[in-house]
Amino acid sequence: MFKDYAKIHVKAGDGGNGCVAFRREKYVPYGGPSGGDGGRGGHVILRADGGLRTLVDFRYRTHYKAGRGTHGQGKNMHGRKGEDLVLRVPVGTEVRRAGDATLMADLTVDGQEYRVARGGRGGRGNARFAAANRRAPSFAEKGEPGEELWLELELKLLADVGLVGFPNAGKSTIISKVSAARPKIADYPFTTLEPHLGVVRVGEGESFVLADIPGLIEGAHRGAGLGHRFLRHVERTRVLIHVVDVSGREGRDPVADFEAINRELAAYDPRLAARPQLVAANKTDLPGARDNARRLAEAAGGRYEVFEISALTGEGLDRLIYRTYRLLETIPVEPAPAPIVPDERETDVTLFLVAREGNTYVVEGEGIERRVAMTDLDNPEAVQHLQELLVRIGVEDALRAEGIRPGDNVRIGRFEFEYSENPTG
């Protein structure tokens, strides 16, 4: 089964908790804190695999989770990093955050990887909080939650040439004759409901990849007849072979069909209208077809080269394929997109904004939200340490400037507190 779209939920591993421990050794009367840090959570990574042709593996499972980092231990022993989760996708997969059109990654090279969800940092053990005025801290940080999000995966086939045209125009017969691809072929419309790829060998060491795109209908650019699903696979091609049934069967007009498909291509993406296109006037072995082929050539008006072929008998295919290859030689291959590197910068805890929402004051800032999420709010000493940080970086002053009063609510990330005057403020 071919599947070119998937929506999945990924969750990176949470960081392990830091440890609260103290040295207890003979002849060491004041051992001091020795709690180690928790391990980082595992990342979720997408890896392009040239052996895959579809996103069908994501059809029955939508939730994926990486491993959690282990907790720190005494004697300054740090926790192990959580196991990364690597999900294999076909080459040509585009990755977006669900509901956001912004491209996160375009995996066009075999083996290319992109981290879609970062594992949470391990919490610091109490040994990291020792200071001149805090010789025996009895608190540690919790592990940071791993990133989680919904992703949309969209596969756009990587082919040099795309076969386009109305259903039953003969595209599948062509690809079966010129390559080893074996799509389903029958004498009725919409026999092909999924794209097929085939390698066309022209000579020694000379070949190109041909894609058989399922038949388009009028309104395809608006999604009619699964048009959006099919048209996306044309986007990466460098040359189009427009297959037109010139037999005139069932009362169809080859010239009208030819013009209708070109309108759909232009309406979907104007760049497709400017893409080099060869026209294959197919089924010339049938009565009256050659007259229609000549009418089609006149309608093309020198804009396109028209080749009279019969995919069934093979007549004219060699000439069409040879011309396609020579045309490809004149069109440069687009360079692979530069890899998108996830932002690894440390978030500055001093960068925050304070806003009022009714009776609640909201403090926003990735750095401070992370610190709160990693604080053990059940430990009074850890809470005091957090309060000292909020005073030191100016959060309390900013809240006062907004008019906060004792008893008002403060929200930082997922956590909400009741404000009280800091006795040291």
From Swiss-Prot:
The family line of this record is:
Belongs to the TRAFAC class OBG-HflX-like GTPase superfamily. OBG GTPase family.
- Give the protein name, as stated in the record: GTPase Obg
**Cellular component aspect of the GO annotation:** cytoplasm
Q: Name one GO molecular function term.
A: magnesium ion binding
In this chain the Obg domain maps to: 1-158
What does the UniProt entry say about where the protein is found? Cytoplasm
Cofactor entry: Mg(2+)
Which Cys-Cys disulfides exist here?
none
Grouped into one coarse class, the protein's main location is: cytoplasm
Give the protein's function.
An essential GTPase which binds GTP, GDP and possibly (p)ppGpp with moderate affinity, with high nucleotide exchange rates and a fairly low GTP hydrolysis rate. Plays a role in control of the cell cycle, stress response, ribosome biogenesis and in those bacteria that undergo differentiation, in morphogenesis control.
This protein's superkingdom? Answer: Bacteria
Pfam families for this protein: DUF1967 (PF09269), GTP1_OBG (PF01018), MMR_HSR1 (PF01926)
User: What HAMAP family does the record point to?
Assistant: GTPase_Obg
What Enzyme Commission number does this protein have?
3.6.5.-
Q: Which InterPro entries match?
A: G_OBG, GTP-bd, GTP-bd_Obg/CgtA, GTP-bd_prot_GTP1/OBG_C_sf, GTP1-OBG_CS, GTP1_OBG_dom, GTP1_OBG_dom_sf, OBG_GTPase
Self-association or partners: how does it assemble? Monomer.
Q: Where does Mg(2+) bind?
A: 172, 192
Coiled coil (UniProt feature): none
Q: Indicate yes or no for the key word Magnesium.
A: yes
Q: Where is the OCT domain?
A: 341-421
What's the name of its gene?
obg
Q: Which residues bind GTP?
A: 165-172, 190-194, 212-215, 282-285, 310-312
A GO biological process this protein is involved in? ribosome biogenesis
Domain (OBG-type G) ranges: 159-329
* Keyword set includes Nucleotide-binding: yes
UniProt keyword annotations, A-Z: Cytoplasm, GTP-binding, Hydrolase, Magnesium, Metal-binding, Nucleotide-binding
